[in-house]
């Protein structure tokens, strides 16, 4: 069986529980994708793939369904430990070409920091495949302007979840791009 996804939706969640696995399950529930058998895949945003809302995407899911997703995931059982999970997205101006999704799951970064980093990763991967010249040592804001001014990258964004650990509990955060037929 092979297919190229035609739709994608983005979701995120956080879960807390005394058990590690249960904290992950609660994060999946918070993201509303707990009923699926998730298969993580690498980071290509398919050509002509339509972004849909979470609500619309959930209509396409059935309990037990094998569901492909790009997932960033992070967990901690340390009190006050800041964790985040981010999926960055970069889309080409030409919809017949593929884009990139990146996963970033750091400790000690805010949601904003983690999100910008993931978005930068995706945009940089796309820029290198499109032949856009840039200085990798420039900061993200400057490179973002170069990427978009080239006319080859039309959009970049991220979806990010962050949380701080709590005493005696596992905390898990996830961010996902859920790919649908």
Swiss-Prot record:
Source taxon at top rank: Bacteria
Entry note: cofactor: Binds 1 pyruvoyl group covalently per subunit.
Sites of Pyruvic acid (Ser) modification: 43
Residues under site feature: Cleavage (non-hydrolytic): 42-43
Keyword tags: Decarboxylase, Lyase, Pyruvate
Enzyme type, top EC level: lyase
EC number per UniProt: 4.1.1.19
InterPro entries assigned: Pyr-dep_his/arg-deCO2ase (IPR016104), Pyr-dep_his/arg-deCO2ase_sand (IPR016105), Pyruvoyl-dep_arg_deCO2ase (IPR002724)
Keyword Lyase recorded: yes
UniProt keyword annotation of Lyase present: yes
GO BP annotation list: arginine catabolic process
Catalytic activity: L-arginine + H(+) = agmatine + CO2
Pfam families xref list: PvlArgDC
Cofactor(s) named in the record: pyruvate
GO molecular function: arginine decarboxylase activity
Stored SUPFAM superfamilies: Pyruvoyl-dependent histidine and arginine decarboxylases (SSF56271)
Family the UniProt entry places it in: Belongs to the PdaD family.
PANTHER family per record: PYRUVOYL-DEPENDENT ARGININE DECARBOXYLASE
Name listed for the protein in its UniProt record: Probable pyruvoyl-dependent arginine decarboxylase
Gene, per the UniProt record: pdaD
